């Protein structure tokens, strides 16, 4: 049983984030990252349970529908065509944040696969990450966006499958209302520039990422 002392020490999620979680009807179970790992090790949380830790809450991940799966595959193909061996592309794998362990659809992290043999990438490792949104757009904008901005993740893409566009968020700002200072929208006929550490590696046509 988890003690209240452990729970109350955690950073508080924003009111808007909690409101979105409640509106989506997701169950709330606030715990620490360490407790979350213990539950996984003990088999209380199984891989097939499809959940992730957001602001100390265990949240059930939505079922991946075919358009979502297809978009992830397309994104990975495009990224791998641009990037060298010094960058790691991780698909639906955990990242380590202060009170969360989300599993973004795609993450570009510095280094090699061996660098993450005994740990998950953290904000300092992450070049940018991508969430594919077909049924999860509100959650990706209202919960995950401030989460990633507050952790200082430099760049966040939302691939909006239904609107046929990509939202690119940069220049994170922390504080009580974390957000990204800059937003760029790319529609189906556009190409999204892939900029890593201030260097443009190329661009990806939006249409090539859409199912």
Q: Each PLM stretch: what is its role?
A:
Residues 1-211:
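Gly/Pro/Ser/Thr-rich low-complexity, intrinsically disordered segments predominantly at protein N-termini
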């Amino acid at each position: 049983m988890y003690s209240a002392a452990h729970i109350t020490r955690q950073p508080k999620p924003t009111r808007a984030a909690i409101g979105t979680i409640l509106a989506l009807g997701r169950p709330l179970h606030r715990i620490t990252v360490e407790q979350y790992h213990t539950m996984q090790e003990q088999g209380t949380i199984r891989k097939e349970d499809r959940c992730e830790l957001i602001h100390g809450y265990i949240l059930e991940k939505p079922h991946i529908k075919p358009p979502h799966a297809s978009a992830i595959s397309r994104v990975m193909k495009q990224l791998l065509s641009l990037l060298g061996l010094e960058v790691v592309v991780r698909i639906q794998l955990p990242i380590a944040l202060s009170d969360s362990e989300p599993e973004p659809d795609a993450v570009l992290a510095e280094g090699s696969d061996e660098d993450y043999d005994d740990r998950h990438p953290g904000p300092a490792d992450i070049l940018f990450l991508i969430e594919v949104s077909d049924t999860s757009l509100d959650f990706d904008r209202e919960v995950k966006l401030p989460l990633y901005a507050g952790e200082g993740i430099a760049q966040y893409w939302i691939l909006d499958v239904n609107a046929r566009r990509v939202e690119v968020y940069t220049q994170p700002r922390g504080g009580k209302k974390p957000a990204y200072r800059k937003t760029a929208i790319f529609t189906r006929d556009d190409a999204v520039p892939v900029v890593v550490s201030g260097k443009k590696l190329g661009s990806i046509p939006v249409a090539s990422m859409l199912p």
